[in-house]
């Protein structure tokens, strides 16, 4: 079975409130078996117009597991905490 990945780029607008999101999202990731591959760190634009300030890449056992995480009560609480703390763009993608 191919792994599932969640790729997000984040524009943090309220760093203090975003810390609460990070606490809650970490608990949700642990509960759903996410492997954190990227969480912040240095970025550099190589091509195009995409220049996110923060990137997150999570690996799950499957595409469906990634979607279950996203729809979970645990992650819903994190999303609620993030609502006024950051602008988020997120996709789920199936690995090879």
Question: Language-model segments: which ranges?
Answer:
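Short S/T/G/P-rich N-terminal loop/turn motif that feeds into the first structured element of a domain
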Residues: 1-55, 59-71, 94-96
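C-terminal structural segments of small proteins and small subunits
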Residues: 63-91
